[in-house]
Amino acid sequence: SEVFAKSHPNIKLNWIRDSTGIIAARVLAEKDNPKADVLFAMAVTSMTGFAKMGIFEPYSPKGIEKLNPLFLDGKKPAEWVGHYGWASAMCFNTIEAGKRKMPPPASWVDLTNPVYKGKITMPNPASSGTGYLMVAAWIQMWGETKAWEFMDKLHENVGAYSHSGSKPCEQAAAGEYVIGLSFPFRAIRLKEQGAPIDIVLAQEGTGWEMQTGAIMKGTKN
């Protein structure tokens, strides 16, 4: 928003930032009378459903031809455009783990080890896109039966569920928990700031998502 304000000083920007599930619910509630002009950095898994409802204004931004086709919806003009891709990851506090002689996890299954009981925090999949991404990935990798068995065991070790996908890594970085299930770029930023965390990508594989943007149909701005 700061960069936009500098390049467009005559435009007042009012923006609402929240978890994927919360924003998605708001978009659905306002679909017949949208309050927003632009939907920005929204999960493509949500955007494809919104596009089917016809709530976006088709628009191809300048330079769109330079983008990888994988970042586009394939329509001309486009209804949504991808910004970046991301994945899920574990944030492991090496200092707190050392105090408790806890081994670093290498896989998702490792998180069910009783040694981690109460020392894991993860995003709530009901409100967080990151949490939803993890659940979806586990089901895709293992099938529903095995995935839900895993999640039941994982739940026994989870000390807290957060509203957002970034908070678990922040909690792990602060030493509130040993392991925070989050995403890599939050972990990288915290690590660069000096947090004693290692970034772990699970051996079994990890879910990924793409953030996108679109213009709401009927916007006056």
Predicted regions and their residues:
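A short alpha-helix/helix-coil micro-patch that ends at or immediately precedes a cysteine
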Residues: 2-8
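Short, well-structured alpha-helical segments in soluble
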Residues: 25-33
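Conserved functional loop/turn residues at catalytic and ligand-binding sites
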Residues: 31, 176, 219
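A ligand-binding cleft/hinge motif common to bilobed small-molecule-binding domains
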Residues: 45-49, 173, 177-196
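Periplasmic-binding protein-like
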Residues: 66-69, 150-155, 161-162, 193-217
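Bilobed periplasmic-binding protein/Venus flytrap-like ligand-binding cleft at the lobe interface
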Residues: 106-114, 211-221
